């Protein structure tokens, strides 16, 4: 339905070259990860002095890299809370996971693979946007990826530490998102990201991740990151956290739900996006 209703503006196939394919990933192999560091996280924003704070801070939690481990994904989907689900294109369980998440009322994002600094040593996987693509190739690949995901309302980047530093490529991506009425969440895989100024230029609704919950899978680390997420939200009014489909992430998040719900309002990520000023 989404593809039929929203992709009517897709470029004509007869004028678009076939995009260069990233090397195929086995349908049984989960996605690779970029290595994140504290330097990719922005300093907390200070709320305006003359603006009254919200009654309660808001936290949006995105679980991304979904589409490969069906059983583990369903553990997150079946949690009795508010999450945002982000699925990888061309993943084997995309359709069934989106259907289950939508039935639960979760918002759905495309987890858009983009070229990392380490490419080609590290592959972003099927459906990736690559720096070598021409504008027509990139737009064709992007429409292919978007059209796979029913109930889609936004996009966040998978990897992308190279491409998110490149304003011309970002303008190509954001021009499509603007046309299709989608927002963008910057996963902040590089401290040099140019996503926010590009979103401002094209007036695309935007937000960025505040905390990676589980770039280490040590249980105590994940607990500390959840506390950081809460503290960020209290300091600036809202915060976005990104987690991944690890069993330990599910277990610690489930354990932390009472504290989260006591301290903050858990909200869908669309609640905290806005056009950058």
Predicted feature descriptions by range:
Residues 58-65, 126-137, 215-220:
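Active-site mouth loops of central-metabolism enzymes
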Residues 56-59, 81-83, 104-106, 150-153, ...:
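Short, well-ordered coil/turn segments that N-cap beta-strands
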Residues 135-226, 244-265, 271:
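Catalytic domains of cell-wall/extracellular-matrix polysaccharide-remodeling enzymes
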Residues 1-57, 226:
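Terminal interaction modules at protein C-ends
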Residues 90-96, 131-140:
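Glycine-rich anion/phosphate-binding loops
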Residues 51-123:
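Active-site beta->alpha N-cap acidic-glycine motif
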Residues 64, 155, 240:
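Conserved, mostly hydrophobic/aromatic
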Residues 269-277:
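Short, flexible loop segments at boundaries between secondary-structure elements
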């Amino acid at each position: 339905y989404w593809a039929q209703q929203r992709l009517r503006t897709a470029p004509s196939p007869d004028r678009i070259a076939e995009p260069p394919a990233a090397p195929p990933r086995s349908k049984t192999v989960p996605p690779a990860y970029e290595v994140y560091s504290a330097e990719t996280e922005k300093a907390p924003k200070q709320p305006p002095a003359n603006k009254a704070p919200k009654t309660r801070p808001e936290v949006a939690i995105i679980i991304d890299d979904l589409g490969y481990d069906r059983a583990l994904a369903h553990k997150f989907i079946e949690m009795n809370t508010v999450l945002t689900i982000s699925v990888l294109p061309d993943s084997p369980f995309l359709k069934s996971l989106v259907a289950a998440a939508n039935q639960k009322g979760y918002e759905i994002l495309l987890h858009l693979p983009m070229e990392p600094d380490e490419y080609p040593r590290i592959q972003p996987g099927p459906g990736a946007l690559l720096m070598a693509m021409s504008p027509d190739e990139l737009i064709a690949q992007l429409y292919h990826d978007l059209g796979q995901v029913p109930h889609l309302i936004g996009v966040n980047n998978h990897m992308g530490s190279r491409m998110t530093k490149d304003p011309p490529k970002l303008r190509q991506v954001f021009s499509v998102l603007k046309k299709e009425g989608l927002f963008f969440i910057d996963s902040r895989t590089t401290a040099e990201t140019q996503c926010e100024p590009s979103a401002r230029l094209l007036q695309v609704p935007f937000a960025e991740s505040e905390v990676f919950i589980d770039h280490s899978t040590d249980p105590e680390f994940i607990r500390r990151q959840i506390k950081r997420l809460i503290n960020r939200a209290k300091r600036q009014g809202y915060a976005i956290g990104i987690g991944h489909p690890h069993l330990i992430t599910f277990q610690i998040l489930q354990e932390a739900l009472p504290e989260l719900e006591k301290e903050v309002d858990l909200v869908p990520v669309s609640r905290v996006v806005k056009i950058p000023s």
